[in-house]
Amino acid sequence: MLIREITDVIERFAPLAWQESYDNAGLIVGRPDDEVRKALLAVDVTDEVMAEAEREGCDLIITHHPIVFHALKRFNSADQVQRCVERAIRSGIALYACHTNLDSAPEGMSWRLAEMLGVADLRVLQPSVADAKVGFGVVGELPGAVATVEFMRHIQRTLGVRVVRHSDIASPEVRRVAVCTGAGASMIGEARRAGADIYITADMKYNDFMTPDKALTVADIGHFESEYCAIQILFDILSKNLITFAVRKSESSRNPVNYLV
């Protein structure tokens, strides 16, 4: 199957036009008319993921994070990014990323995470100016009020999160939940204005936990943990629309952050 036939399916769900201006989603290594037989899905392209692709005969790796994000001036295997790009070219493995366009797509990243946690009646938290159905984050309702601490333990159990960093508990119970996968500290204000009892995101800094008037609880579940659902979203898109194309979920895609607890 041609790469363009595969990426066309993904981009019908999450068009590249929806990515942020700073992003580098799309085909990074390879040509649209290259023929591929099997895709590997991962959060990041790493040495381990490259080895798995070679071992399993995958000639296309589709990730959430683009391996080339900042401009590269040379390829001399000095770091993992350079090694993986060089290895992909030598091995004939194409690299494709579906990043902020998947974040902002309806039924995309935040939608999936919220649904996994039992949050319903979802709407976009920060709509795009061009299209109110597109944007970052979601806010919705739980079927009933849940103790705040118990809901955070529910997050741990459901997502396999080892550590939840959180602010002071603003309310003993939560009903309205805001979610933004990845780094979402900049949207605390939107979550507050949406009337959320708790805001679930990642990459929070020290001062981010000092929410004004303690109006809501903010919970940092980890960047990788919040975005691991990208693999399943991409798998669902491809397996539903390309039933004869082989797709594998990576067993080597792992969190680069380690915890000593």
Where are these regions (language model features)?
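Active-site catalytic microenvironments in core metabolic enzymes, especially phosphate/sugar-handling
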Residues: 1-261
